[in-house]
Amino acid sequence: MRPIIETHSVTMRINGATLVDGIDLSVGSGEMVAIVGPNGAGKSTLLRLLSGDLQPTQGRIELKQADLRSYSAAQLATHRATLSQHVNVTFPFTVEEIVRMGAGDMAIAAAHPLVESAMDEVAIRPLRSRQLPTLSGGEQQRTHFARVLVQLACGEARHGPGLLLLDEPTSSLDLRHQIELVEIAGRRARNGTAVIAILHDLNLAVRFASRIIVIHRGAIVADGPPAQTITDGLIRKVFEVCADIQYHGDGSPVLLPQAMKSIGPGNLL
């Protein structure tokens, strides 16, 4: 499996606080990786480092065996596509115009089938003439996801399998569209894309990801297949809650959270 993105002892400090602490990871073509962890663990900071939006205080990041810093912004956009957690939605463009932005400088005629395909896959074709600010939060999220899919398709047509980064992509979506989004991401992984998604819903993560990376206090504390990674002890330690863990027929775990019980000021069991 060819590595798409690798980090080597990556650390990020801001104002004396260590947000990411000595991260070593490698994600290859065809992997669907979910990053999970509590709020403030460093997940979004790590994703911004992988996207090139932030530069690490220490360590090195390689995208397709080249230093991430060696890519220009234009080059980077053809090798990785990112759906950020917070996207500016005040500009008065239509859904179709937003999705077409993913094609960059590609001619409109050439981009047209990619735009149509992405809108169909994300089920936003009926919204194509609507201006973005008039949509619900979930509809806006799906529009931006379609834009990112177009960007990814354009880049992979030129350079082969790329990197898809998703920062809490399901946060504004109802259950149906949460499942559809992660299934779409999974299809990209099966076609060779390296997919890394921050997911807060552990059941979504363990059901659809082939690999789980658990971040706690800026460091990786677990990394592996869902059935081996998500354990009762890890849930207690990292998330400070109890959960009954059951298993699907394929061995993937299902988490059934228990009511939280206080064991002292600021502590939960």
From Swiss-Prot:
Keyword Ribonucleoprotein set for record: no
ABC transporter domain ranges (all copies): 5-242
Membrane topology designation: Peripheral membrane protein
InterPro entries reported in the protein's UniProt record: AAA+_ATPase (IPR003593), ABC_transporter-like_ATP-bd (IPR003439), P-loop_NTPase (IPR027417)
GO MF terms, alphabetically ordered: ATP binding; ATP hydrolysis activity
Location of the protein in the cell: Cell inner membrane
Assigned EC number: 7.6.2.-
Keywords, ordered alphabetically: ATP-binding, Cell inner membrane, Cell membrane, Membrane, Nucleotide-binding, Translocase, Transport
PROSITE patterns: ABC_TRANSPORTER_2, HMUV
Pfam families noted in UniProt: ABC_tran
Cellular component terms per the entry's GO annotation: plasma membrane
Domain of life from the UniProt record: Bacteria
Name of the top EC class for this enzyme: translocase
Metal-binding listed as a keyword: no
Predominant localisation class: membrane
Entry binding sites for ATP: G37, P38, N39, G40, A41, G42, K43, S44
Xref: CDD domains: ABC_Iron-Siderophores_B12_Hemin
Function: Part of the ABC transporter complex HmuTUV involved in hemin import. Responsible for energy coupling to the transport system.
Quaternary structure, from the entry: The complex is composed of two ATP-binding proteins (HmuV), two transmembrane proteins (HmuU) and a solute-binding protein (HmuT).
Entry's family note: Belongs to the ABC transporter superfamily. Heme (hemin) importer (TC 3.A.1.14.5) family.
PANTHER family: HEMIN IMPORT ATP-BINDING PROTEIN HMUV (PTHR42794:SF1)
Name by which UniProt lists this protein: Hemin import ATP-binding protein HmuV
Species assigned in the record: Nitrobacter winogradskyi (strain ATCC 25391 / DSM 10237 / CIP 104748 / NCIMB 11846 / Nb-255)
Gene transcribed to yield this protein: hmuV
